[in-house]
Curated annotation (Swiss-Prot):
Function: The insulin-like growth factors, isolated from plasma, are structurally and functionally related to insulin but have a much higher growth-promoting activity. Acts as a ligand for IGF1R. Binds to the alpha subunit of IGF1R, leading to the activation of the intrinsic tyrosine kinase activity which autophosphorylates tyrosine residues in the beta subunit thus initiatiating a cascade of down-stream signaling events leading to activation of the PI3K-AKT/PKB and the Ras-MAPK pathways. Binds to integrins.
Official protein name in the record: Insulin-like growth factor 1, adult form
Lineage, highest ranks first: Eukaryota, Metazoa, Chordata, Craniata, Vertebrata
Keyword field: Disulfide bond, Growth factor, Secreted, Signal
Compartments it resides in: Secreted
Species: Cyprinus carpio (Common carp)
Annotated disulfide bonds: 50-92, 62-105, 91-96
Amino acid sequence: MSSGHFFQGHWCDVFKCTMRCLSCTHTLSLVLCVLALTPATLEAGPETLCGAELVDTLQFVCGDRGFYFSKPTGYGPSSRRSHNRGIVDECCFQSCELRRLEMYCAPVKPGKTPRSLRAQRHTDSPRTPKKPISGHSHSSCKEVHQKNSSRGNTGGRNYRM
């Protein structure tokens, strides 16, 4: 055996040993990290909803019905909670489920669907188009300014009292 072949074989053995040791070190580090993080993950549990996040979630869950921050009296089972607890107490300070969020939605009015409510909003007060006064349809800018000044209008804004 030549000395070159001996050194080449020796370096291969050293390289293999080093790779095994690095591999073991990385594996051990990974296992320790997983073990260290596991108890925190188990204790965390579901997330809570507070502030704008709670409002956005309620709007999504309740839709057009709307929602209450405190439950109306006689709405849902009240034996488990005190009278002054609301959605913030139940879903911000502790986690809550979808069923709990739905309890704070306003009840659906019988016979009205969200679509009919939307349509009704647009048809409740029909607006009549303004009719131009005969003979004054082509007023000059100066005439319009004089009319507005005589009415006490400032800055082109219309104020109603």
